[in-house]
Design a protein with these regions (language model features):
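Phosphate/NTP-binding elements of NTP-utilizing enzymes
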Residues: 1-164
C-alpha cells in the first residue's frame, strides 16, 4: 500500500470537474479504472461517512480492474483494519467506505443502505440493458446523499446503454 497518485492532465481534468454525472468513453489502457479508483478514494477521504460504490459487469472483472489498484493506493493510516478481500470493501477511519460489486449479482445492489454518495460504473457498455434506470438511478434519488455518478467504459457498438 501507499502508492503515490500520479494522474495525466486529462485525468486530473475529469477528477476536478464538479459535475454530478460524468461520462468517460475512451480506448483500452488509458487509465479509466485507475482514475475511478483515485476518485473513489479521494471522495471517501474528503468527508466522513461517505459511501463509494464501484460496480463492474462481474465481480471477477471489478476485482481485476479496480480492486488491486485501489488497494495499492490506500494509505494504511487512512483505513480501519485491512481491505476486506471477500467483501471487496475498504473501511476508512472517518467512517467512509468503498465497496466493489458486480452486475452479475444484481440483487446484491438493491437496497444498499446507506445510499451511496459516489457511484462508479466501470465498463458500462458491458452491463445489461436498463441496469442504470432499474438499479442505479434509484440509488441517486436520496436528496440528502446526492450521489455523484462516474460512468466509464470502452465503447462497444451502438446497442447498449452506454452508447445511448
Amino acid at each position: 500500500m501507499n502508492h503515490k497518485i500520479e494522474l495525466f492532465d486529462f485525468q486530473q481534468e475529469v477528477l476536478i470537474d464538479p459535475s454530478r454525472f460524468k461520462v468517460m468513453a475512451s480506448g483500452r489502457r488509458v487509465g479509466k479504472s485507475y482514475l475511478a479508483a483515485v476518485a473513489a478514494y479521494q471522495h471517501c477521504l474528503e468527508e466522513p461517512n461517505r459511501r463509494a460504490l464501484i460496480i463492474g459487469p462481474t465481480v471477477s472483472m471489478i476485482r481485476e480492474s479496480i480492486w488491486l489498484t485501489l488497494k495499492s493506493l490506500v494509505h494504511t493510516e487512512h483505513i480501519s483494519g485491512y481491505p476486506r478481500e471477500i467483501d471487496l470493501e475498504i473501511r476508512f477511519i472517518n467512517g467512509s467506505k468503498i465497496t466493489l460489486k458486480g452486475f452479475d449479482r444484481p440483487d446484491a445492489l438493491r437496497g444498499i443502505s446507506p445510499s451511496p454518495t459516489f457511484i462508479v460504473l466501470d465498463e458500462f457498455a458491458y452491463i445489461k440493458q436498463n441496469a442504470f434506470t432499474e438499479v442505479i438511478l434509484p440509488m441517486t434519488s436520496d436528496p440528502q446523499r446526492k450521489a455523484k455518478v462516474f460512468v466509464i467504459s470502452t465503447p462497444k457498438g451502438i446497442t447498449n446503454d452506454f452508447y445511448k
